[in-house]
């Protein structure tokens, strides 16, 4: 799984500001004092190789009328994960860019990471998390890591002919509520040079989604990128990918089983005109999510020459 990412839209801020200043005239303004709320976004990712397991926790908060200067730093918090058999480890404080790419928040928050101790956590384990805040408050939650699964009949590296689609299937993961299908494609700008299709990102990251625990089939690459299709300039590339990948590119493909907590926090619920409403899985003196995932991946080389490598199965 990739780092947690928060994106802030200056355009949205401008629209809201313009609406307030010019869209209406208010005769009376009531200021409501907003309490400080700590938000914890905690994820534990289990990979094929236990050495690749990682846990991340990002703590931030809504700021009340007192402002951040009146509050103890969240970097003084302690984040502990405990398996039901008593095995326990504490996450280590790290720079915030280990948890997210950028932050629009007045207070950037606090990031905690653990890698080596997480190697002992496996699919199906029940893990509890405890966040101890510098104020003395506690935030708690628990998750059962999705069960083990495998990608069917695809080796860790395979060769795919140009302009060819391949069917990716996998076994079901118990406790999974959905699957994230991701790919990172390298070499597209050069491979499509002169085709009239402009690609600026290299690698190009595309995301697909299987929305239930039994939805275990996806077509590569045509069914990846469902969240990119409304991105400016992506339409031509999306049509091109319906026929497969061009000669010379490489791709990393992954399927990640995600738990109930992850799905509820990501999807929120039904459409809300006022914005996304997230469903938390943490409680106590704060709110947030404790999500667990299990990932599987393989690499694809697009070529007419196998060079002794196994061919990617097409179905």
Label each residue range with its predicted role.
Residues 2-12:
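Bacterial N-terminal signal peptides that target proteins for export
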Residues 24-315:
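A sequence/structural signal for flexible, mid-protein segments enriched
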């Amino acid at each position: 799984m990739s780092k947690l990412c928060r994106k802030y839209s200056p355009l949205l801020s401008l629209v809201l500001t313009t609406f307030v200043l010019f869209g209406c005239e208010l005769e009376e303004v009531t200021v409501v004092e907003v309490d400080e709320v700590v938000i914890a976004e905690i994820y534990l990712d289990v990979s094929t190789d236990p050495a690749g397991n990682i846990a991340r926790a990002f703590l931030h908060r809504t700021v009340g009328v007192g402002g951040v200067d009146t509050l103890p730093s969240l970097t003084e918090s302690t984040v502990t994960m405990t398996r039901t058999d008593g095995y326990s480890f504490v996450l280590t404080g790290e720079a915030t860019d280990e948890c997210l790419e950028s932050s629009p928040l007045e207070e950037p928050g606090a990031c905690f990471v653990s890698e080596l101790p997480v190697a002992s956590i496996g699919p199906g384990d029940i893990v509890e998390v405890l966040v101890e805040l510098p104020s003395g408050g506690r935030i708690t939650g628990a998750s059962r890591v999705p069960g083990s699964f495998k990608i069917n009949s695809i080796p860790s590296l395979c060769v795919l002919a140009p302009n060819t689609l391949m069917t990716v299937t996998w076994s079901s993961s118990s406790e999974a509520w959905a699957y994230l299908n991701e790919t990172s494609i390298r070499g597209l700008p050069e491979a499509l040079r002169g085709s009239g299709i402009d690609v600026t990102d290299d690698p190009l990251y595309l995301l697909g989604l299987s929305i239930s625990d039994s939805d275990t089939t996806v077509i590569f690459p045509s069914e990846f990128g469902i969240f990119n299709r409304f991105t400016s300039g992506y339409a031509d590339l999306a049509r091109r990918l319906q026929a497969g990948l061009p000669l010379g590119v490489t791709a990393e493909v992954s399927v990640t089983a995600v738990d109930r907590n992850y799905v509820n926090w990501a999807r929120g619920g039904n459409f809300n005109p006022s914005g996304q409403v997230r469903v938390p899985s943490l409680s106590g003196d704060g709110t947030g999510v404790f999500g667990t995932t299990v990932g599987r991946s393989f690499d694809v080389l697009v070529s007419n020459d196998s060079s002794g490598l196994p061919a990617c199965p097409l179905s």
